[in-house]
Amino acid sequence: MSEHRARKRFGQNFLSDPNIIRKIIDAIHPVPGETVVEIGPGLGAMTDPLVERLGHLHVVEIDRDLIARLHERYSPERLTIHEGDALKFDFATLGAPLRVVGNLPYNISTPLLFHLAEFAARVRDMTFMLQKEVVMRMVAEPGTEDYGRLSVMLQYRFRMGRLFDVPPGAFRPAPKVTSSIVRMVPLPAEQRTAKDEALLERVVAAAFGQRRKTLRNTLREWLDEADFPALGIDPGLRGERLTVADYVAITNYIAAKSPRALANA
């Protein structure tokens, strides 16, 4: 089969450095018997060692040319191929506990992370390679430039850890940016205390929708000036100053104050 050319519409950059590949696989530490799914196996740089260590692997791939290569290379007993868009894939069908890994396409990384977060209850952990600037947003702390909606919503559900960086030269073709490896471990359900997570998402989206505006303005759909002292929060702050716990407290306060907010979330 002829050499596959990376496709921009799928955000393809193929990992090719054997030392980096080994380091990533060691960080994942796959063990036979685990249910592991790789998103975007590409040319199989991570697929080969994963199959070797696990015995069987699930993959989700949208590129039909790459799917044909995978069918040629692996037997169904070793590799289960799920053809389609990872953004629409129901990861719950693979069972639990599930481990999710992959070199995520840069062009869909943020919506894909939000999609994957929906399956947190069924996941043991997730280890991804992403654009470094996205990873910095994922692990950012309150009060920093990178802290935003992605930070809050992922940190509400996961314990996040940036493991190490991957230089552009480790890929073919080489991207213009550095990548990072991030691990996401779901938090226990008892630590996720928002009474309604859909409402939490709305509150966080509003707080960061216009970053230069204060909470007094961004949250006025739900909170009056008198509500902020009850919460112990300064209405003159901007969204990036609040912790995840602050957003949960605001959400639960709104839910208690106005049951309609829950119904409309």
From Swiss-Prot:
<feature type="binding site">
    <location>
        <position position="15"/>
    </location>
    <ligand>
        <name>S-adenosyl-L-methionine</name>
    </ligand>
</feature>
<comment type="similarity">
    <text>Belongs to the class I-like SAM-binding methyltransferase superfamily. rRNA adenine N(6)-methyltransferase family. RsmA subfamily.</text>
</comment>
<feature type="binding site">
    <location>
        <position position="61"/>
    </location>
    <ligand>
        <name>S-adenosyl-L-methionine</name>
    </ligand>
</feature>
<feature type="binding site">
    <location>
        <position position="85"/>
    </location>
    <ligand>
        <name>S-adenosyl-L-methionine</name>
    </ligand>
</feature>
<protein>
    <recommendedName>
        <fullName>Ribosomal RNA small subunit methyltransferase A</fullName>
        <ecNumber>2.1.1.182</ecNumber>
    </recommendedName>
</protein>
<dbReference type="GO" id="GO:0005829">
    <property type="term" value="C:cytosol"/>
</dbReference>
<dbReference type="GO" id="GO:0052908">
    <property type="term" value="F:16S rRNA (adenine(1518)-N(6)/adenine(1519)-N(6))-dimethyltransferase activity"/>
</dbReference>
<dbReference type="InterPro" id="IPR023165">
    <property type="entry name" value="rRNA_Ade_diMease-like_C"/>
</dbReference>
<dbReference type="Pfam" id="PF00398">
    <property type="entry name" value="RrnaAD"/>
</dbReference>
<keyword id="KW-0949">S-adenosyl-L-methionine</keyword>
<comment type="function">
    <text>Specifically dimethylates two adjacent adenosines (A1518 and A1519) in the loop of a conserved hairpin near the 3'-end of 16S rRNA in the 30S particle. May play a critical role in biogenesis of 30S subunits.</text>
</comment>
<feature type="binding site">
    <location>
        <position position="103"/>
    </location>
    <ligand>
        <name>S-adenosyl-L-methionine</name>
    </ligand>
</feature>
<dbReference type="InterPro" id="IPR001737">
    <property type="entry name" value="KsgA/Erm"/>
</dbReference>
<keyword id="KW-0694">RNA-binding</keyword>
<dbReference type="InterPro" id="IPR020598">
    <property type="entry name" value="rRNA_Ade_methylase_Trfase_N"/>
</dbReference>
<dbReference type="InterPro" id="IPR020596">
    <property type="entry name" value="rRNA_Ade_Mease_Trfase_CS"/>
</dbReference>
<keyword id="KW-0489">Methyltransferase</keyword>
<dbReference type="InterPro" id="IPR011530">
    <property type="entry name" value="rRNA_adenine_dimethylase"/>
</dbReference>
<dbReference type="GO" id="GO:0003723">
    <property type="term" value="F:RNA binding"/>
</dbReference>
<keyword id="KW-0698">rRNA processing</keyword>
<dbReference type="InterPro" id="IPR029063">
    <property type="entry name" value="SAM-dependent_MTases_sf"/>
</dbReference>
<feature type="binding site">
    <location>
        <position position="13"/>
    </location>
    <ligand>
        <name>S-adenosyl-L-methionine</name>
    </ligand>
</feature>
<keyword id="KW-0808">Transferase</keyword>
<keyword id="KW-0963">Cytoplasm</keyword>
<feature type="binding site">
    <location>
        <position position="40"/>
    </location>
    <ligand>
        <name>S-adenosyl-L-methionine</name>
    </ligand>
</feature>
